[in-house]
Amino acid sequence: RNAVAAKMQDAHELRCGSVAAAERAYALGYASVALETICDATQSSDAKPLDWGEPRDVETLKTAPRLRLLKRLTVRLDAPRMSVPQKVLNAFDIVAVVPETDDAFRAACSCNDVDLISVACGARLPFAVARKDVEVAIKRGAAFEVSYAHAIAQPRSLRHLTATGLRLAALTNGGRGLVLSCGSPDTWRVRSPSDVGALASMLGVRNTDGVVG
């Protein structure tokens, strides 16, 4: 299960919390969208992929050419290890972790079941982004994700996003293994691939043709 970029390569990807956001993503030019299930680590054994709805609700998406519909699990982790049943992991295309402590960040970077380490950028990080942990994650094929939704309307959040993004871009060799994501079910927060590419350039990502969303 590693190398999340391989699952999305040559295609812009967007994580969505609603079908409406997914529809807007496709209209903006994204080639794959992921509907996201979010849970705490204690609830992960009961996690199930969200339903895309009745066929009539997603007819445009399911018949769209070159569009991939993905299922994503995002686990909020505050413990030094992640324990999610394999049958749960197998039900999803992408497994992401939002670490909330230093130990959780270290665990997410080293766990082979984790595709994405999702860093919440709406406030100051509750853990240190250590170079050695980042290198462990990149070596095994995982990627780091920063979300821009909060930064759109809140200047303070934009400062946190910029600081975190610059740090991760520097530690990932110019943004290799860095994913920029909306991270919101609100359609108005979804930005086009070109807008996200501009943000990536601002953060020091040298190649903005990679995975953004």
Give short role names for the model-derived ranges.
Residues 80-81:
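Hydrophobic/aromatic-rich structural module bridging two neighboring secondary-structure elements via a short loop
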Residues 27, 62-77:
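Extended, charge-biased low-complexity segments
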Residues 1-35, 41-59, 63, 84-86, ...:
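Charged catalytic cores and adjacent phosphate/nucleic-acid-binding surfaces used
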